[in-house]
Amino acid sequence: MRTQVLFLVLEVAAMASGDDTPHVYCGRRLAIMLSYLCDNQYLMKRTPYTSSESEGYGWRWLAPQRARQLAGARGKRQGIAEECCNKPCTEDELLGYC
């Protein structure tokens, strides 16, 4: 536990010093960094909207998995986990969620 806290303190210090190298942020680390950068006012997760039309993505001839893949290819903004947990992201990308 102490090691994790030390690591987070060092990470926050590096970000405060202007280090803009991409890092991977997941779980608690992501929440702490958002809280620090956004002054405790980052966007909270909303309940997903689902309807019978959006569930099928309007493409009834496609399998649901393939329809979701195609829907994502239209330039829809990814969630913060996709941007910062699955791949490294910068402080500027994190600030986009404030």
UniProtKB/Swiss-Prot annotation:
Disulfide bonds join C26-C85, C38-C98, C84-C89. Keywords: Cleavage on pair of basic residues, Disulfide bond, Hormone, Secreted, Signal. Residues 47-75 form a propeptide. Gene3D superfamilies: Insulin-like. Heterodimer of a B chain and an A chain linked by two disulfide bonds. PANTHER family: INSULIN-LIKE PEPTIDE 1-RELATED (PTHR13647:SF4), INSULIN-LIKE PEPTIDE 2-RELATED (PTHR13647). This is Bombyxin A-3 homolog. The gene is SBXA3.
